[in-house]
């Protein structure tokens, strides 16, 4: 899965965080840029399409707009939060935003490897640690802690893969933006 620019291809997935006492089921709606592994995350108590749209609308698209970069396509699995008729909220949102919706082959999660890898990282480095340290009574403080971790992941934590070569995701994106200007 190659992309020549930030925002050209994003991968999205919904990850079951757990059943939290007093809250119920909690899901992470994750989006990862295939260009430099920049990641976004929104916690919600459902897998509904509206929650999957919320992370795009509130976090992802404003980020790329600030950089002056278009979002070309989003790759998802075939989950109900992402797929349906043209009036499906996620499908409709992407169409109205002029973003291509690509889908993985059924039952082939490795096709969406960028976001699957991120899910493993966020599970190991954030959720397993925080859930042992903190009792969360609502989603909001957990989201605040996730937001702080995402700042670390995107701006402080070096990524050793061939795309970033030890750079942080924001460095990879900023490097592209500088070269294009």
Which residues does each predicted region cover?
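A short acidic/small-residue loop/turn micro-motif
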Residues: 35, 45-49, 79
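Active-site beta-loop-alpha junctions of metal-dependent nucleic acid enzymes
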Residues: 42-67
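Acidic/histidine-rich, metal-coordinating catalytic segments
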Residues: 65-85, 105, 163-166
């Amino acid at each position: 899965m190659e992309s020549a620019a930030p925002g050209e291809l994003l991968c999205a997935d919904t990850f079951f965080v757990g059943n939290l006492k007093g809250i119920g089921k909690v899901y992470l709606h994750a989006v990862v840029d295939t260009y430099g592994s920049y990641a976004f995350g929104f916690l919600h108590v459902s897998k509904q399409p509206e929650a999957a749209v919320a992370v795009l609308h509130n976090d992802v698209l404003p980020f790329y707009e600030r950089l002056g970069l278009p979002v070309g396509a989003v790759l998802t699995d075939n989950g109900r939060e992402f797929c349906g008729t043209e009036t499906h909220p996620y499908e409709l949102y992407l169409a109205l935003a002029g973003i291509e919706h690509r889908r993985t082959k059924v039952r082939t999660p490795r096709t969406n490897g960028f976001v699957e890898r991120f899910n493993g990282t966020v599970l190991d480095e954030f959720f397993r640690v925080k859930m042992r340290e903190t009792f969360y009574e609502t989603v909001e403080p957990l989201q605040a802690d996730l937001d702080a971790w995402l700042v670390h992941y995107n701006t402080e934590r070096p990524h050793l893969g061939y795309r970033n070569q030890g750079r942080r995701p924001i460095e990879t994106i900023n490097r592209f933006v500088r070269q294009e200007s």
